Amino acid sequence: MDEKDLATQPQETGQDPRLPGQDAHPRGAQGAEAQAAEGPLAAHAQGAPLKSLKGDSAFRRLRQGRTGRGRYVTVRWLPAPELRVGIVVSKKVGKTVVRNRVKRRLREILRRLHLPRAHLLLVATPEAREAGFAELFQDLTRALKKSGLVQ
């Protein structure tokens, strides 16, 4: 019997191989999400999406805010009634696919952190394209501490 024929052979239990077994979670992928939601990051694992910082005036106001710099990210923030985030990744970082990857990683890191209410601006440096998720996480956390937003 060839390996390619193995997938088409019915299982010996008499159950259709395309149907989940009795031990499978009845709601599919939500079981995996529920497991990921356990632990110290549980509040943000299934939290609402981040609100975007919009408008040129909001970005200009942040120039007067507190600043923290890291190797991959510069952080600027001002206290505000709600958390809003602006992420800037210039074309110096790379082509669109690379810039979007950096933005997605930064957004996910922010979702995992417990941040106070503030208007927050993240500016990625060109070196951010080479950084992995863990490196970005450490660098952003360090920059947020330097800026005084988190302890």
Swiss-Prot record:
Gene: rnpA
Name assigned to this protein: Ribonuclease P protein component
One GO CC term on file: ribonuclease P complex
Note: The open reading frame (ORF) for this protein entirely encompasses the ORF for the 50S ribosomal protein L34 (rpmH). The two start codons are separated by four nucleotides.
GO biological-process terms attached to the record: tRNA 5'-leader removal
Protein family: Belongs to the RnpA family.
NCBIfam families on file: rnpA
Bias (Low complexity) ranges: 28-48
EC number of the protein: 3.1.26.5
Organism (species): Thermus oshimai
Region ranges (Disordered): 1-62
Role: RNaseP catalyzes the removal of the 5'-leader sequence from pre-tRNA to produce the mature 5'-terminus. It can also cleave other RNA substrates such as 4.5S RNA. The protein component plays an auxiliary but essential role in vivo by binding to the 5'-leader sequence and broadening the substrate specificity of the ribozyme.
